[in-house]
């Protein structure tokens, strides 16, 4: 009897061992198979050193609006543009998510949270946006949040960690949040003046009205028959405002760009290609401009355009022979010009114009609507295809129609979007699925450049300008 029992126990043990081994084998096989499957699309942390970083300044051979994300030959996405497009695909027909993002050093419940900001914060998290999910990201939660959000593209996280300064990181973070999740980002020192649902981007009747009352503006490649009524009626995918429109001869002494887009408040759908290009540019710039990037940058960038990646060659400094272009950046030598052209409104504006020029060049169905070209303010309306007539000089000098000839020539001869298209805006403008709001919308009460008061119908957000990042950065770098 004892022999039979011993044999039975041994048999059961053997079966248990066999089953356990088979189970472990199955789990390992599944894990390895799953890992191989994921590696076809997402590079691991060990692989991201091989990621190629295309320059955004030379994208003449690609249609940025219709980016294809599958490399059929290698079945792997080695290009950061491809990786971003695949990880965060863009759905132009989806609504803008009802989310509001803000960031600060500490959470709102922390005793060190500025008391003045509580009033501003309540406008974003209160009755003006009751149906919106509000998120305040504090400094100590940024890295864990990004590591989860951008796990498919770890090189982006690497670049974020390498940034020499919190101002650069704050700029980069807003683009990363909107690209991955969408919604509205607004600086902590901003106040929401009107309910979000009253914004032109949220108002379907306004969108329908602007389409009905304004003919699409032609450009060289345009084919009106290709414009789909369904596409036209969709909510914009990116909503931005004018920050600066200095119509003066000495504008370059005060501003980085003649038309500068505001980035303290941005509304977007996740995956928008402009944000993708911005993230690509900032990631590549960071890795190429800082000390000890931890990756073989020279093997990742396009050797034909090395200067595109170095922040020291941006804007005015490109032709400054006295500037040390080879000097790598650290937290002691980053100044206001670096921030402006690395993550700030300078590069933000450049990327937007580059994208618009690209889509006009490669697509024949881009919707261009500019009510500011169709009317002469109080003088009534005219067609955008004919020059302004019988308008006094003072009125014309403060109207977009002042630049009618330049705008028409740029669009119809070279598929080029001129900055003049966005000057003196009183009404929102549409370029494909990008809506550009007048300076009054996010900069009321500034008392210049045509900005109106907070009571104006087009005033939606007020910036309190509590920060002085450029002055602080210049002092940090030893500038006066």
From Swiss-Prot:
Glycosylated. Induction: Expression is regulated by SKN7, SLN1, and CDC4. GO terms for biological process: protein N-linked glycosylation. Residues 1-15 are cytoplasmic. Gene3D superfamilies: 3.90.550.20. Pfam families: Gly_transf_sug. Residues 31-480 are lumenal. Its cofactor is Mn(2+). This is Initiation-specific alpha-1,6-mannosyltransferase. It comes from Saccharomyces cerevisiae (strain ATCC 204508 / S288c). The gene is OCH1.
């Amino acid at each position: 009897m004892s022999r039979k029992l011993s044999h039975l126990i041994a048999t059961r043990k053997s079966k248990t061992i066999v089953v356990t081994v088979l189970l472990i084998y199955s789990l390992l096989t599944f894990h390895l198979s799953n890992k191989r499957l994921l590696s076809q699309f997402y590079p691991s942390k060990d692989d991201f050193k091989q990621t190629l970083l295309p320059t955004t300044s030379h994208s003449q051979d690609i249609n940025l609006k219709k980016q294809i994300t599958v490399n059929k030959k290698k079945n792997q996405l080695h290009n950061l543009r491809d990786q971003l497009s695949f990880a965060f695909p863009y759905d132009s027909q989806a609504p803008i998510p009802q989310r509001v993002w803000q960031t600060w050093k500490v959470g709102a419940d922390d005793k060190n949270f500025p008391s003045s900001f509580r009033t501003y914060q309540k406008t974003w998290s209160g009755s003006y946006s009751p149906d919106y999910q509000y998120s305040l990201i504090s400094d100590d939660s940024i890295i864990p949040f990004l590591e989860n959000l951008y796990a498919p593209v770890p090189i982006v996280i690497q670049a974020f960690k390498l940034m020499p300064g919190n101002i650069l990181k704050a700029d980069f973070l807003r683009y990363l949040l909107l690209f991955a999740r969408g919604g509205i980002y607004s600086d902590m020192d901003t106040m929401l003046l009107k309910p979000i649902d009253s914004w032109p981007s949220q108002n379907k009747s306004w969108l329908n009205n602007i389409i009905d009352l304004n003919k699409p503006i032609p450009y060289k490649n345009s084919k009106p028959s290709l414009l789909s009524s369904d596409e036209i009626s969709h909510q914009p995918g990116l909503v931005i405002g004018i920050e600066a429109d200095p119509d003066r001869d000495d504008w370059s002494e005060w501003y980085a760009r003649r038309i500068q887009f505001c980035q303290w408040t941005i509304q977007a759908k996740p995956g928008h290609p402009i944000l993708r290009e911005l993230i690509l540019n900032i990631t590549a710039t960071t890795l190429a401009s800082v000390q000890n990037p931890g990756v073989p940058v020279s093997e990742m960038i396009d050797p034909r355009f090395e200067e595109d990646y170095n922040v020291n060659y941006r804007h005015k400094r490109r032709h400054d022979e006295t500037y040390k272009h080879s000097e790598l950046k650290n937290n002691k030598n980053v100044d206001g010009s670096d921030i402006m052209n690395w993550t700030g409104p300078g590069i933000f504006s450049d990327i937007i114009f580059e994208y618009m020029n690209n889509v006009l060049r490669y697509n024949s169905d881009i919707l261009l609507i500019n009510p500011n070209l169709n009317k002469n303010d109080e003088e009534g309306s005219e067609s955008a295809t004919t020059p302004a007539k019988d308008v006094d000089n003072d009125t014309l000098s403060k109207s977009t129609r002042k630049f009618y000839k330049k705008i028409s020539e740029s669009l119809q001869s070279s598929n080029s979007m001129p900055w003049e298209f966005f000057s003196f805006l009183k009404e929102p403008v549409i370029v494909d699925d990008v809506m550009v709001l007048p300076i009054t919308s996010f900069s009321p009460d500034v008392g210049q450049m045509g900005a109106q008061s907070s009571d104006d119908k087009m005033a939606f957000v007020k910036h309190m300008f509590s920060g002085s990042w450029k002055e602080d950065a210049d002092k940090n770098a030893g500038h006066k």
